[in-house]
Each structure stands twice: as structure tokens, then as C-alpha cells.
Amino acid sequence: MARLNLFYLFVTLLLSISLRPCYGLPEKTTSALFIFGDSTADPGNNNYINTTAGMRADWKPYGQNGFFEAPTGRFSDGRVFVDFIAEYAKLPIIPPFYQPSADLTNGVNFASGGAGVLPQTNQGLVVDLQTQLRSFEEVQKSLTEKLGEAEAKALLSEAVYFISVASNDYLAGYLDNPKMQEYFVPEVYVGMVLYEKGARKFGFLNMSPLGCMPLMRARNPKSSEGGCFEAASGLALAHNNALNVVLTSLEQLLKGFKYCNFKFYTWLYDRINNPASYGFKEGVNACYGTGPYGGVYSCGGKRMPMEFQLCDNADNYIWWDSYHPTERIHEQIAKTLWKDGPSVGPYKLEDLFFNKERLTIADILDAPNEEHFQH
């Protein structure tokens, strides 16, 4: 019963701004992009909030590859995958929500490094998903004031909504909190993690093999043997299985619901174990960090330990630091999401941005309400 209630709560939240398909608005070749998530997609929102060094990345060696003039707050040696997606969609780089005077008409990036779905994940240090969703409502109001109601609703209905979040709920929540382990079996915990608002077209980055991060290898009781921390990876697999079930159900419940779900676990696991096959030299150790596998997160010397090692060429590495991949992996993620059929489905992101299906304002206003799903 708890799992069923969580599922319907997810559906209700989705339907709160869910939009239904039809065919009447003028054709437009590019949709706006709205991004919700964590450090995998954060463009620098954490620069603007009161947080700790561990939740920021606006100093070197972050951003060292020179694409940006200075470190931006991205947890990478350069760009993150949503920057590439914007490029492929013929959009400018999507601005952080907290960036002053940002142009909102091409979309907004709400992602915050360290964030989770659950408010207690890194509480007080990040912008959790529920707060990100409230910020989206502010953007809706702002766009309506700027563009007028009809044009704003048309823009939002055509937009693609990308969600990359949940790792921190496990890394900073479930694994480190015995009470969470007691009260939440993985499937129920996953249900709590799947709270979302959105529209009709979604992109999802499902969970990576968490136990293979340099951080988790270093925490593995058998770290001397070099293996992944299977307890963490098992949670990721449970999450991905639950996500697949929920998305399949939503596709049946919501007419016109379309999504791109990236099988990130197997995709990244293959690169970690076979780096040379994908143009890398190192799949286990981080380019930047200290301790076993570079798994101790030093924040560029901003917190203990102050010392860290930095590789000569991040392009040879899968892992940039103890948590995060390099820009080169981010670029491969984006290319896969955009065009690669075997690892994504049932749609590619390119399909979601450039399909010819249109929405009418009448159908937007006539979206189903939550009472249809009361149980």
C-alpha cells in the first residue's frame, strides 16, 4: 500500500503541470530546456547560495580545460552534459536559475550540486528538488508576465524537461543513515526519490554504478582488492528498475507522455571496465583528488586534506574527481542521449526536441486533474 500511494503521489505531482498533446500551435524547430538535478548538471547555482566548500566548484582545478574563462561552478574540468545538449538543440547554454538577469525564454537550469529529492539530503547546504520545483513555478509566472499567458504556455508545453537527480539521496542519505536503512527498503525509498513535476516531454539520466565511483571504491571494505562497492551499486540497480516501471506506467496513463530514459548504469560500467574501447586510458582512478583511487574529495585544497594530485590530461580519464566524470564523458553522455538508440529509449532526445507534434492551448488548459488518480 505504501508503494502504491507513493506511485500515485508521483503521478499527482506530475499531473499538476502535465500537458496533453494536440496539433495547433505554429511549428517551431527548437524547444526550451528546463533542467532539474544535482552536480551532474549544476551550471553554478551553488555559487549563489550559502553553502560549504564541498558543495561548490567555482575554483581551480574545476573548469581547467579553458572552455570557460574561469571556473563556473560546474563539477567538471569543463562542461557538463546539459551544455552539450543545449548546443545540439541549437540553444544557448542554459543559465543557472540564480544568475541575475538571466534570459529565461530558452529555459532554465535549476540543478544544485549535492541536491537530492528528499529535503533532508545535505539539508541547508543545497537546493533540493522540491525547492527547484517551486523555483520553476516562479519562472512560469515570470514568463507569463513577460510573454503573455498564451505564449508562455506554448513555450512551456513545447519544452523538454531533463531530470538528473537521486544519487545524493543514496550517498548522503540511505548509506550513511542507519534509520533510513531500517525504515526504507530500496523499492520504497526509490518511490520517495521519484517525486517530480514536469510537462509532456522528459529526459531521464538513470543511476550510474554508484559503487564504482572513486569515492565508493575507497569506502569499500575490500578496497585493497580494487573492486566496486556492491552495496551502493545494488541501490542504483533497484532505483533504475523502479524508474523503468514508473515510466512505463505513466506512458500508459498519460496520453502523449514521451520520455528518453538513458541506461546510464550499463553504459558507464562498460566504459569503466573497458576504457580503451572508448578512447580512455584510466577507468578506475580519478584525475584529481587524493587517497586511494583519488577517492578523497579535497575541494581543490579548500578543505582537509589540503594536498591533492592532478593528472596531466583529464581527457584520458573517465573520472574527474571522486564523484564526478570528466567533460569528455559528459560529451559522450550527451551524444548518446541525443542520437544513440540502443542505450536510450523509447525516444532519443533529438526526437523530443524536433518532433512535429504540437499542442493547443485548449488541451493545455484541459490537462487531467489529480482527482482522477485518487485511491
What label would you give each PLM region?
Residues 2-375:
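Conserved active-site regions of diverse hydrolases
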